From Swiss-Prot:
Disulfide bonds: none annotated. This is Thymidylate synthase 1. The gene is thyA1. HAMAP family: Thymidy_synth_bact. InterPro entries: Thymidate_synth/dCMP_Mease, Thymidate_synth/dCMP_Mease_dom, Thymidate_synth/dCMP_Mease_sf, Thymidylate_synthase, Thymidylate_synthase_AS. Keywords: Cytoplasm, Methyltransferase, Nucleotide biosynthesis, Transferase.
Length: 230
């Protein structure tokens, strides 16, 4: 994607606020507690909720671990990334990783999107995302949109222009139960992409709230229901 427009589906309505809330839960709160997500009126992780109320050592848990050394102290992956992008932009090590082999068995679900790599070149922030697995009906539209939002957020708080956005998928698939509705979706009219407004006053990554995002002129087809595969 060249980022001339926001990558969001128009052939059906995407629950874009839910996608951003999940992003904030993982990247900003660095939480694995499903109750934190429920407080945002989001329930997409409820069926993976364990007895302790969490999804185990997955997603936000990995980002919140203080395992990087910075100025004599330990910080987590997100804080390290933000610092390095600002202070060492030419580094080829701007990477976050959710795939921790030592803790995969402690995760309610192994991460689908597991890695980001960031590049700064000529004042622009580029992002490459890697997903081991993406179902095209549900997971892909969510992930492609929300990580593009993340790129825009981090570009804003680090002071860079928006660069290219790459989303790599190892295993891209369609579930049999989704085929009929996907055929309907494929026949639908596509509309021009909306404009994503992000509050320009926010300069700290941890100050973003859902109220700092607006989709302007989001024209889309009717909602299509797809059963969540478990």
């Amino acid at each position: 994607f060249d980022n001339s427009e926001v990558p969001i589906l128009t052939t059906k309505k995407l629950a874009w606020k839910t996608a951003i809330k999940e992003l904030l839960w993982i990247w900003q709160l660095k939480s694995n507690d499903v109750n934190d997500l429920n407080k945002m009126s989001v329930h997409i992780w409820d069926q993976w909720k364990q007895e302790d109320g969490t999804i185990g050592h997955a997603y936000g848990f990995q980002l919140g671990k203080k395992n990087r050394s910075l100025n004599g102290e330990k910080v987590d992956q997100v804080d390290y990334l933000l610092h390095q992008l600002k202070n060492n932009p030419s580094s080829r090590r701007h990477i976050t990783m959710l795939w921790n082999p030592d803790e995969l068995d402690a995760m309610a679900l192994t991460p689908c999107v597991y890695e980001t790599q960031w590049y700064v070149k000529h004042g622009k922030l580029h992002l490459e995302v890697r997903a081991r697995s993406n179902d095209m009906a549900l997971g892909n539209p969510f992930n492609v949109f929300q990580y593009n939002v993340l790129q825009r957020m981090i570009a804003q708080v680090t002071g860079y222009e928006l660069g290219e956005y790459i989303f790599n998928i190892g295993d891209c698939h369609v579930y049999t139960r989704h085929i009929d509705n996907l055929k309907i979706q494929m026949e639908r009219e596509q509309f021009e992409a909306p404009e994503l407004w992000i509050n320009p006053e926010v300069k700290d990554f941890y100050d973003f709230t859902i109220d700092d995002f607006k989709l302007i002129n989001y024209k889309h087809g009717d909602k299509l229901l797809f059963e969540v595969p478990v």
